[in-house]
């Protein structure tokens, strides 16, 4: 008789549940490990001797997978671009959610966004999309700036483009940015569960948004600015424009399930497809963000969920929107206090060359959640 048969029924059932949950937990813990390199771009431990020689002493690089480290080695100069893109994505995330209960908090160390990424909620969807977009955006821009040895401007668009303009200049290399972003970011995902599919979908949604927001820029040529001929190229959007689009997609995100529920004849490709939880809704497009788990309310502190709550947050007493005290403070009320602030004012430029200012003191009214 085996040891398993000697265990009480409730113990064996508990162990079975724990073992079943283990692969998903491991996959969740491995997701986003590359975010730990966020400070590499400003690290003194990274020494770059030339574009063709990098000496890396940064401990956080151990958080990368073997494939990710290989991609870094094969593309000298790209590590700073990846880290810089991640930093920009973090700033954009904080900006987009600055007036909401969840305000994209971050922490030092390998777990940049905290425990919220262990949940399959909307907030996790946005985090994956904006960080993926940040890498694609930064790498594409670095290519056109000549900061990465393995890529340049996108010179494929050449020749006449229309009756009064032609392609020229230095287009941002969005194709290289998307390809590298897909290879680098997606390789950090492990497993074949719903979380895996959700993360991959949202990663791609971030990259797709950067691509779809590309714009054509032109420069005029001709006598006295007559603009008889124009030279045009493709330019990346600002990351703020990408963040605005992704925040709108966050508000309209699709709740999903595995595809082909109840079918025993589904192929592997069909099983690895996301379908809306509500059959009346259309399937998510490549631009949409997807999630499968309801978000916490973020009102109170929870160590288990990694939520800080909204106590002490500044709110707008006259706003009915998400930044208003009623919604942001979750109905708990708010306190009002005054603060005397001294700022520079009435500044004047003197030739040549200095600026003189006065110090002005005024009273600021602050409202904070209880």
Swiss-Prot record:
Changing residue 123 to D: In OI15; reduced capacity to activate canonical Wnt signaling. One of its GO terms (cellular component) is plasma membrane. A lipid is attached at residue 224 (O-palmitoleoyl serine). Residues 1-27 form the signal peptide. Keywords: Developmental protein, Disease variant, Disulfide bond, Extracellular matrix, Glycoprotein, Lipoprotein, Osteogenesis imperfecta, Osteoporosis, Proto-oncogene, Secreted, Signal, Wnt signaling pathway. SMART domains: WNT1. Ligand for members of the frizzled family of seven transmembrane receptors. Acts in the canonical Wnt signaling pathway by promoting beta-catenin-dependent transcriptional activation. In some developmental processes, is also a ligand for the coreceptor RYK, thus triggering Wnt signaling. Plays an essential role in the development of the embryonic brain and central nervous system (CNS). Has a role in osteoblast function, bone development and bone homeostasis. This is Proto-oncogene Wnt-1. It comes from Homo sapiens (Human). The lineage of its organism: Eukaryota, Metazoa, Chordata, Craniata, Vertebrata.
């Amino acid at each position: 008789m085996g040891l398993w048969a000697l265990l009480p029924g409730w113990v064996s059932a508990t162990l079975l549940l724990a073992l079943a949950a283990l692969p998903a937990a491991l996959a969740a813990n491995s997701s986003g490990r590359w975010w730990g390199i966020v400070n590499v771009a400003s690290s003194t431990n990274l020494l770059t001797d030339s574009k063709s020689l990098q000496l890396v002493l940064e401990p956080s690089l151990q958080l990368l997978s073997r494939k990710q480290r290989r991609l870094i080695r094969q593309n000298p100069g790209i590590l700073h671009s990846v880290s810089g893109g991640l930093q920009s994505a973090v700033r954009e995330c904080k900006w987009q959610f600055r007036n909401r209960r969840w305000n994209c908090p971050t922490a030092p160390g390998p777990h940049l966004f905290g425990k919220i990424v262990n949940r399959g909620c909307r907030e996790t969807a946005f985090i994956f999309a904006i960080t993926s977009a940040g890498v694609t955006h930064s790498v594409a821009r670095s290519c056109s700036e000549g900061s990465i040895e393995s890529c340049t401007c996108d010179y494929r668009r050449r020749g006449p483009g229309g009756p009064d303009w032609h392609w020229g200049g230095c287009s941002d290399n969005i194709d290289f940015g998307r390809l590298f972003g897909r290879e680098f970011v997606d390789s950090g995902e492990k497993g074949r569960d719903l979380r895996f599919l959700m993360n991959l979908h949202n990663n791609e949604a971030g990259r797709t948004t950067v691509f779809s927001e590309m714009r054509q820029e032109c420069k005029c040529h001709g006598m006295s600015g007559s603009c008889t001929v124009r030279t045009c190229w493709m330019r990346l959007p600002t990351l703020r424009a990408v963040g605005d689009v992704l925040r709108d997609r966050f508000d309209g995100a699709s709740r999903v399930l595995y595809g082909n529920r109840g079918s025993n004849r589904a192929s592997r490709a069909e099983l690895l497809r996301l379908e809306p939880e509500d059959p009346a809704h259309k399937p998510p497009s490549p631009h949409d963000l997807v999630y499968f788990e309801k978000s916490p309310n973020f009102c109170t502190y929870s160590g288990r969920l990694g939520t800080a709550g909204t106590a002490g947050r500044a709110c707008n007493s006259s706003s009915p929107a998400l930044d208003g005290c009623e919604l942001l403070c979750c109905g708990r009320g708010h306190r009002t206090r005054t603060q005397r602030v001294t700022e520079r004012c009435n500044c004047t430029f003197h030739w040549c060359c200095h600026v003189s200012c006065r110090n002005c003191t005024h009273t600021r009214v602050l409202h904070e959640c209880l």
